[in-house]
Amino acid sequence: MATTITRHTKRGSVPRVSAVFFLFFAWFAIAAATAYSQSPQKPVIAPDLAARLAKYKPVKMPFDSSHLSDREKQMVAKLVDAAGLLDCIFWRQSDPEGLKLYVSLADSKNPQDQMLRELLKINGGRFDQIDDEKPFVGTDPMPPGRGFFLPHETRANLEQQISRGRFEKSAVYSPYTIEKICAIGTDAEYYGPCFDPYHAAFGDFLNPMAEDLREAAALSDDPAFAKFLLLRADALLSDDYYPSDLAWMDLENPKFDVVFAPYEVYLDGLLGVKTSYGASIMIRNDAESQKLAMFQKYVPELEESLPLPPEDLPSERGKHQPMEVVDAIYRAGDLLHGYQAVADNLPNDPRIHVEKGSKKIFWKNFLDARVNFVILPLAEHLMPPEQAKMVTGEGTLDFVVLHEISHGLGPTYVHGSKRGIGEAIGPQYSALEEAKADITGMMCVKWLVDHGAIPKEKLNEIYASFLGDGFRTIRFGIAEAHGAAAMMEISYLSERGAIHRDPSTEFYAVDFQKMPAAMASLAKELLEQEATGDRARTENWFKKYAVMPPELAAALAKGSDIPVDVDPDFDFHPPVR
């Protein structure tokens, strides 16, 4: 049920509200009008669309269905249809006005319009992810609350409305609500800001989406996967993902798998709690998946090795850590737009972590593209030749695997409470968690080397691959969570002498002797920030370290011909509306 301001203003009657309260509504109305005042048909467009698009490498992601049965092909088609509907919701969360413009350009044959449309698709809206979210359409800055909140909403105003009893805190901070103007009351006798649950706000898309999942379940030859799809269909219509997340964790080496839920909070720059919908339809790579089995058995010992007191480590946590190497057949939502993930650790629900653990997914087709088209060329450009050749796809995969494992390690809640770490830290949480996973993951690499699980001679290869990947990530800018995390890490490690720049060659190199101690020190700091939930400490830390030095910016600029990311081109193109 939506929560809202509780004053009544019957339609057709004189509003009985105070002047202050009237101004509150007027403020929202004016803000909304301002946000929507610019016609999507005649926007001011950045003149350098071609240059912006050139920063992305188009990569075909073909799907070989020749080995599938007819039923499997039909099942995949149903899942793609569902993902297309999910993408429509994501656009409304990310940039509703950008969606209008994107749809309006669909039939245009104008090359400029098609370039603009592609850039809108890449970014999921009008704001350039690798230019600190500055607009390339119009001049209005990106609202920190995106489409989750009313235009010009602020954290201070929301907290004030909560304290006055006009909003329920649980609704404001729910991962599955969106702020809108609602008709409220038994007879819809008044209007006002409210927080509507996703399943109500997006029902026009979620209902047919759930039906597609049910039809896909009927076509599946895997009973466990079919059961999961049915439970996930129910979850889409209730916003209760717990039962289906449990079923997802119980899947054993499925041939097909999906990510299909609002999981990540990267888009919410206002509160850092609203989840955006994302989807990936995947087919398992058995040979590569079997190679990861070694890592799974060490997870409990890796957790125990963390530099935290026992009271800040989970007393109970499911240690089930399934790992799947897959190829993406199709992706949608926050897995299609923006930063192209090569791995994920899901679900994010701490209750699932306690009861079951978490699943690590590695998209091989995306990792191969990232390494070949971005990381290796960038390493050759920024690192001395003897270290650049140490950057490898295998070293990058090891780093990525331990990164994802480390998302599931460390504090589950703020020390001494059941308060979520994300709620406590706020918008900076996404960057903090990405940095924690990076650095704790590298600590885990050292532990595995020390205990003979990884050959000693591999350690420096993984350190070099870590730096090569870090250079790739900071090109997204510090407004993006992964970019902010990587910039902070490089700054701190440079301060500790573990990374150093040679001014004569302008190359950046790893000091392999200093790296372990510097990594351990940084891991301790980041884990303590999560354990304490100290928002000011985290904000000040990133304010100090997530700053691009001019000399690094200049070095990156010289490599402008190297793509920043890949732009996947799938065999499927469901319509967006």
Give the location of each predicted region.
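Fold-level signature of zinc-dependent metallopeptidase catalytic domains
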Residues: 49-61, 66-78, 169-423, 427-431, ...
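Zinc-dependent metallohydrolase catalytic domains
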Residues: 89-96, 368-380, 384-398, 411-577
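N-terminal secretory signal peptides that target proteins for export/translocation
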Residues: 1-15
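N-terminal intrinsically disordered, low-complexity regulatory regions
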Residues: 93, 99-101, 108-218, 226, ...
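Signal peptide processing junction and immediate N-terminal pro/mature segment
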Residues: 31-39
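Bacterial N-terminal signal peptides
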Residues: 18-32
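N-terminal mature-domain "stem" immediately C-terminal to a signal peptide or N-terminal signal-anchor/transmembrane
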Residues: 39-126, 130
